[in-house]
Regions:
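Class I S-adenosyl-L-methionine-dependent methyltransferase catalytic core
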Residues: 1-185
Length: 185
C-alpha cells in the first residue's frame, strides 16, 4: 500500500495501480527524493510550486508534492487504467481542483498550455530509455525553464542522461534505484 509520507495529507493511503506497465517508486526512494529536493544544495521550494509528474503511474510523486504544499500538478500518463487511479487518488485527497491529467505518451508532447514547471518528476519504466525523449519533448513544447529542477528515477545500472540539453546536478542510489537531478544546460 502506498501512503503519503508528509504534509497536510500525511498517512493517507493511495489507491495502487494494478497495471503491469506501472512500477511504483518505493517509499524509501520517494522520501529520499523529497529530502534531496527541499534540503541540501538543491533547496527547492515546494510551497506553491508547479510540478509535472511524467510517467505518473498512480500519481504518488505528484500527490506527495501537493500534500507538501505544491500549488498545482500536471500528471502525464498514457495507461488508461493508471489515469483512472490518478483521478481517483486526486479526488479522494481533495486535490482535483489543483491538478490536470493528460492521457498521452510523455514522449509525444508537442504543445504545452501550462506554465513552465518548477519541478519535474520523470519516472519512466526501468531500462526503457524513455526519460530523455520525454524530457526533450517537454522542453521543445515549452514546459521546462532555466530554473526547473528535474528529478529522474532510473535503475541504478542505467547510464545517466546524455546527449540532451540537461546538466546533472546530483545523483544518489537507493537499492536498485538511482535518483538523478538535472537542470537545463
Amino acid at each position: 500500500m502506498i501512503s503519503i509520507l508528509a504534509g497536510r495529507k500525511k498517512g493517507a493511503r493511495l489507491t495502487p495501480c494494478d497495471s503491469p506497465s506501472v512500477r511504483p517508486t518505493s517509499q524509501r526512494t520517494r522520501e529520499a527524493l523529497f529530502n534531496i529536493l527541499t534540503g541540501g544544495r538543491l533547496n527547492c521550494v515546494l510551497e506553491g510550486s508547479f510540478v509535472v509528474d511524467l510517467f505518473a503511474g498512480s500519481g504518488a510523486l505528484g500527490v506527495e508534492a501537493l500534500s507538501r504544499g505544491a500549488g498545482k500538478a500536471v500528471f502525464i500518463e498514457k495507461d488508461p487504467s493508471a489515469v483512472r487511479v490518478i483521478r481517483r487518488n486526486c479526488e479522494i485527497l481533495d486535490f482535483a481542483e489543483d491538478t490536470n491529467i493528460l492521457t498521452t505518451d510523455a514522449c509525444q508532447i508537442t504543445s504545452w498550455r501550462f506554465d513552465i514547471a518548477d519541478i519535474i518528476f520523470c519516472d519512466a519504466p526501468y531500462d526503457s530509455g524513455l526519460s530523455l525523449p520525454a524530457l526533450d519533448a517537454l522542453n521543445k513544447a515549452g514546459g521546462i525553464g532555466l530554473d526547473t529542477i528535474i528529478a529522474v528515477e532510473t535503475r541504478r545500472k542505467e547510464p545517466e542522461l546524455s546527449g540532451g540539453d540537461f546538466t546533472l546536478l546530483d545523483s544518489r542510489h537507493y537499492g536498485i534505484a538511482r535518483l538523478s537531478f538535472y537542470k537545463l544546460s
